[in-house]
A protein has these predicted regions:
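Short, Lys/Arg-rich flexible segments
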Residues: 1-154
C-alpha cells in the first residue's frame, strides 16, 4: 500500500495516506478475515468453496474435471470499491466496529460474486444433479457460509 500511495499525486493522495495511517494505527491490535473460515464455516462448505475457487479433478466417473470458478478473487474489486466508500465514516475511537463493518462488506462481496455469476456453465451431468442451472448456486450453502471474523493480533 505504501508504494502505491507514493504514486498518488496531489493533496488528495496525502490526505488518503494520513487517513489510512490513522486506520492502521487504530486497528493495530486486531485484523479481519473473510471467506470460509475454520471454526465458523462448516468443513463441507470450506471444501466446496475451495473446489469451486480453484477447480478440482473428476468428481465422479461420469463427470469431467471441475473448472475453477474464482468467485472470491472476482469479488475483490467490488470489495475494494465498497471499502473506499466506507473510509470517511471510520472513527479512530471505534476500530473494532470498523473492522466488523469491513468484514461484513467482504463477506457480502463474496455472496454477491456467487449470485452475479459470469462463470463457465455447468456440465450436463452437473445440471442433472442439481435444481437450477446457475454455477455455484444449488442449496445456498456457499452463500450462507461466507463469513467474517475479527481477530486479535498475536
Amino acid at each position: 500500500m505504501g508504494a502505491t500511495l507514493k504514486h498518488v499525486a496531489g493533496r488528495q493522495g496525502s490526505t488518503l495516506a494520513r487517513r489510512l495511517q490513522k486506520i492502521r494505527t487504530a486497528c493495530s491490535r486486531s485484523y479481519v478475515v473473510a471467506g470460509y473460515i475454520a471454526g465458523v464455516s462448516t468443513p463441507a462448505a470450506i471444501a466446496k468453496a475451495y473446489k469451486n475457487e480453484f477447480g478440482a479433478g473428476r468428481t465422479s466417473d461420469l463427470d469431467k474435471p471441475m473448472p475453477a470458478r474464482p468467485f472470491m478473487a472476482m469479488a475483490i474489486p467490488d470489495i475494494v470499491y465498497a471499502m473506499r466508500k466506507s473510509l470517511p465514516a471510520f472513527h479512530v475511537e471505534q476500530p473494532e466496529e470498523f473492522l466488523a463493518s469491513a468484514g461484513a462488506v467482504m463477506a457480502n462481496g463474496i455472496r454477491e460474486s456467487i449470485d452475479l455469476g459470469g462463470f463457465r456453465p455447468n456440465a450436463p451431468y452437473t445440471l442433472s444433479q442439481k435444481r437450477g442451472d446457475k454455477p455455484l448456486v444449488d442449496s445456498g450453502e456457499m452463500q450462507a457460509e461466507a463469513a467474517f471474523q475479527v481477530r486479535a493480533t498475536a
